[in-house]
Amino acid sequence: MAWKMMDGYEMVIGLEVHVELKTKTKIFCACPTTFGAAPNTQCCPVCMGFPGTLPVLNRQVVHYAVLAGLATGCTIARYSKQDRKNYFYPDLPKAYQISQYDLPLCVGGHLTVETEAGEKRIGITRIHIEEDAGKLVHDPEKGTLIDCNRCGVPLIEIVSEPDIRTPQEAVAYLHKLKAVIEYTGVSDCRMQEGSLRCDVNLSIHKKDEPFGTRTEMKNLNSFTSVQRAIEEEYRRQVEAIKKGEAIVQETRRFDQTTGKTSSMRRKENANDYRYFPDPDLAPIVLSDEVIAGWRKELPQLPDVRKAAYMADYGLTAYAAEQLVSSKYLADYFETAAQSTTAVKMLANLMISEVFRLLDGEDAKIPLNPAALAKIADMTEQSLISVGTAKKTIDALWNTPEDPEEYVTRMGLMQISDEAVLAEYVCKAIDTHPEMVAGYRKGKLTLKNALMGVAMGLSGGKANPVVLQKLMDAALDA
């Protein structure tokens, strides 16, 4: 169900997206970043903050952060620094997080997203590097346990401008951002593994009035959760204001089971974290030559591929947008397109059928690209119907059988022989004279009924275009 404005209250949304970088080691030490390792087996005195240890910045983290900044149109700072963000929480052994406060690495970017009203430009305030905290594991028998493997895993935090006005725009922005980051190769963006997490800042106000007090919902790990959390928090704030209650600046938790948000703690301000430059880390200084060299590494990004698909293959903006929504899907499409001239049909089958069969945002396609290309060719050449193409994709999804051999073996080839189809048309007309008479008296919908009879006589294998032509000729004779 689409979101609807309540009582004239507009929402104002800003997103903070945390992306785990795909480095082999952590941001300030040599510990590995492998996902799923046994608890507390990938940490050392440096990432645990033991006295006397010194951090050493991983150059690859800066490299990847700059690539993300360049891909989102940011200005790259020639001089930036790292700061300590001080707070106490069980998953933060050092009692401070190394982040960036007033001099981030990247500033002033944007993404353009497709909305129901057309294209919309959403600003990106900044991208900065920081280290991740550990993870609390809640066990009903043992209580809350702490896994420090994630401490020191490198992150970039991508902070949007408060330009988003609907849940749908928020999800569109996240889809676009995820695609851009995947294309650069700096992260796998696997939300189910926590390598892309989203915090939502939301306030409401009436048009031409000042923005309201914002609340924050943290660590949302799916696009569906983001949309549901926004819709629910908007509803809660509107109802609270209508009751005369004040909106408190706080952090709230979204419960996926109940679909409700609940208060976690009062929201801190920057001063509460007592930021100061980390005395153990030198400033990050980048030359124009280094940045120019990294810029050359940028791959072809989604918007460029989208424009190419529209120009080269004649695809619609919608179809092209769907295909470039993931680098994996775009690569698969391009590989399949090399084996067929029926590229539009290929795109249609991917969007309507392949996407339907994918299990989750990060699922892979087991069907060989060349096999899908052959199915597109057979459909374009009217050897099989679109319905048969869909059945064939379903049947061969996890098997290596050749599509043409499968269709032949199952007797699914479409009948286009006019002599054969003419017999079905004649039989349909001869056995239903009342429909023919009704059609000729002006009940034109009866032609569709006769088409259905003839199609049934063919076992559903008749080429509908040829069958339609023959039926028209017979009825108008």
Set out the residue ranges of the language-model regions.
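Short, basic interhelical loop/turn and adjoining N-cap
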Residues: 457-464
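Core structural elements
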Residues: 193-206, 310-334, 343-360, 396-399, ...
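Strongly charged, low-complexity linkers/loops
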Residues: 363-373, 377, 383-457
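Residue-level detector of well-ordered alpha-helical segments, enriched
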Residues: 319, 332, 342-350, 371, ...
